[in-house]
Amino acid sequence: MKFTTYTTFPEQTSNESLWILVDSEQLQSNLNTYQINNLESILTATQFKANFNETLPLFGQLSTQPHSQLLGLGKAAELQAAKLAKLAQTIIKSAQNKFKHIAIDIAALPVEYHYLFALSLTQAAYGYDEFKSKKNEFVLQQVDLISSQTSLDENQLALVHAVQSGQSYARDLGNRPGNICFPEYLAEQALALAAEFPDLLKVTVLNEQQMADLGMYAFLAVSKGSERPGRIVTLEYQAQLEQAPVVLVGKGVTFDTGGISLKPGLGMDEMKFDMCGAASVLGTIRALCEARLPIHVVGAIAAAENMPSGKATRPGDIVTTMSGQTVEILNTDAEGRLVLCDTLTYIKRFNPAVVIDIATLTGACVVALGKVLSGLFSPDDTLAAELQQAGEQSFDRVWRMPVIDDYQELLDSPFADIANIGGPHGGAITAACFLERFTRDYRWAHLDVAGTAWLSGSAKGATGRPVPLLMQFLANRVSTNG
């Protein structure tokens, strides 16, 4: 979907439908720009008040656009960002299968919401039909956004397009089943990205023998139960090599049975989404390549499959990590931190400015924050504040949680340096504290996206979060650093 901005209705374009957003407190003034036949009698007859998400068809009443509708904002001054998605869904649901080109008058929408509204339209327009014999009949390609004043300059529109591309790509990867999307497949996707953007990307793939040579036995403890070998993949986005890089590390457990600590069968199909952290890293790298932001970024993917077998790790096994620390694996279903800890050690070779890991790490984070906010853990107040700001700007929000020494003793083991679980309480925090032990040589933040990376129920599927947040964070760094 492509966007173009106009200050007035573009009568010479090929748009087939017009939506006009209207403020319930300024209904008449919002419509003064348009010559609408019988407006007063229509409003009286329909009792249209422009309440939130209330629609009013005006078919044949505008000479400039026969197919037009009003869409209420309620009181625009009281509109909240959380409601933008609903407005976008209303428009997309109505237009997506009918029109290639539509126009939306957003003059009544507060200017500070223009970027988020455009982004919401792209998110609402996503559909996944890769494995369906009957494909979605989506035809919408172009949206004209009309407002005499807008925050959507050329840079903002470029960011919308880039985020749309990266987020949709991440959603596609997340939605693919485990028999298609396995560790080697993620490595192939990274190589395909590099082939698409050869001037921007350098990809390195580590196989299991190379990991063993580096001493990555925590990672290998996860992948050893599977017939599918694990991979660590790095993608270096080389637009500004003289800078120390931002490193993004994604958990890529392509299917998580729990291993010997087997998960319950109900809902296990959703464990294909346990690689959504890695998908978000790949999506962010794609978005960076589309936007060509002048910044140095490294994406790292820890890709493994966690399966039970005669070769699988047993509860109580002890392994040595790449850092030299030993780990007692009390629960093989706490595997994400094991693939991440070795990857977080490996990426030190890039001399990072900051490191952000993204992982569907704990059910405890879902209990704490639900499906609305991602968990943010960082001992670095400045980095945490930057991520919180980016989350608000992109409406891909986070909530900061503690990662403090008081919790570290819960990870003590009588047999090894550290246990891979910390008991029944504060599971999201102790998981972050585990990772913190491997990140003390650089600035670091951890995003637990177990609650936000996918949805269940009727809207089941990957969300592509936190690609919008990560791209906003990187764009902000470009702006700050000039």
Curated annotation (Swiss-Prot):
Reactions that this protein is recorded to catalyse: Release of an N-terminal amino acid, Xaa-|-Yaa-, in which Xaa is preferably Leu, but may be other amino acids including Pro although not Arg or Lys, and Yaa may be Pro. Amino acid amides and methyl esters are also readily hydrolyzed, but rates on arylamides are exceedingly low; Release of an N-terminal amino acid, preferentially leucine, but not glutamic or aspartic acids
EC code(s) of this entry: 3.4.11.1, 3.4.11.10
Binding-site residues, Mn(2+) 1: 256, 333, 335
Subcellular localization(s) per the UniProt record: Cytoplasm
Tagged with keyword Cytoplasm: yes
Cofactors, names only: Mn(2+)
Residues that bind Mn(2+) 2: 251, 256, 274, 335
Molecular function GO labels: manganese ion binding; metalloaminopeptidase activity
GO CC entries: cytoplasm
Active-site positions on this chain: 263, 337
Similarity field: Belongs to the peptidase M17 family.
Stated name of the protein: Probable cytosol aminopeptidase
Taxonomic lineage: Bacteria, Pseudomonadati, Pseudomonadota, Gammaproteobacteria, Moraxellales
